[in-house]
Swiss-Prot record:
This is Protein spitz. It comes from the Eukaryota. Residues 1-28 form the signal peptide. Residues 56-71 have a biased composition (Low complexity). It comes from Drosophila melanogaster.
Length: 234
């Protein structure tokens, strides 16, 4: 009898220690019956009962404030072509010059080429070295103009040399032609047509025979005479 009581007390002590060590099994260890929750009036009227573990749902309204951001207006300015002085000398390193009018005043800017930066595109983007140099279009225009001037001066010298050579040859040929004509006139002076082989009768006037030169020789003689007179005037 005493041994059975001690065994019962030991079992009770083990059960209590187990319940204290695992509190989530206290409900299972309890010998009381858990009362079932009563159904609400609405559920009893509708005939459907809520589950015992379902918590009451509370509706809450949240106010959200939405902020709208207005985009910035896209303002564009009309661009104009720079004057010739600015277009040739203002922008550097093959940059493009353009102007923008603000309050009726032109503001000049440069559109830099790839690899350059700065107000006048005078800096490199890598090491910021200063490279002021004249734009290539200006140098190309200067070279073309100088080449055209050299060609024009050369043509003038060639034309002048040909003119002087022609004048010299014309003067020489005109002088030789004049000498030949003078010699022919001296040989035929005092002779008449009727008495080349015999003397003229008394009272007959001698007729001087004028020898006419061919047409091409007369034309050449006229040109040479004109050239001589023109050279004497100069």
């Amino acid at each position: 009898m005493h041994s059975t009581m001690s065994v019962q007390h030991g079992l009770v002590a083990l059960v209590l220690i187990g319940c204290l060590a695992h509190p989530w099994h206290v409900e299972a260890c309890s010998s009381r019956t858990v009362p079932k929750p009563r159904s609400s009036i609405s559920s009893s009227m509708s005939g459907t009962a809520l589950p015992p573990t379902q918590a009451p749902v509370t509706s809450s309204t949240t106010m959200r404030t939405t902020t709208t951001t207005t985009p910035r207006p896209n303002i564009t300015f009309p661009t104009y072509k720079c004057p010739e002085t600015f277009d040739a000398w203002y922008c550097l390193n093959d940059a493009h010059c353009f102007a923008v009018k603000i309050a009726d005043l032109p503001v000049y800017s440069c559109e830099c080429a790839i690899g350059f930066m700065g107000q006048r595109c005078e800096y490199k983007e890598i090491d910021n070295t200063y490279l002021p140099k004249r734009p290539r279009p200006m140098l190309e225009k200067a070279s073309i103009a100088s080449g055209a001037m050299c060609a024009l001066v050369f043509m003038l010298f060639v034309c002048l040399a040909f003119y002087l050579r022609f004048e010299q040859r014309a003067a020489k040929k005109a002088y030789e032609l004049e000498q030949e004509l003078q010699q022919e006139y001296d040989d035929d002076d005092g002779q008449c047509e009727c008495c080349r082989n015999r003397c003229c009768p008394d009272g007959q006037e001698p007729v001087i025979l004028e020898r006419k030169l061919p047409y091409h020789m007369r034309l050449e003689h006229a040109l040479m005479s004109f050239a001589i007179r023109r050279s004497n005037k100069l």
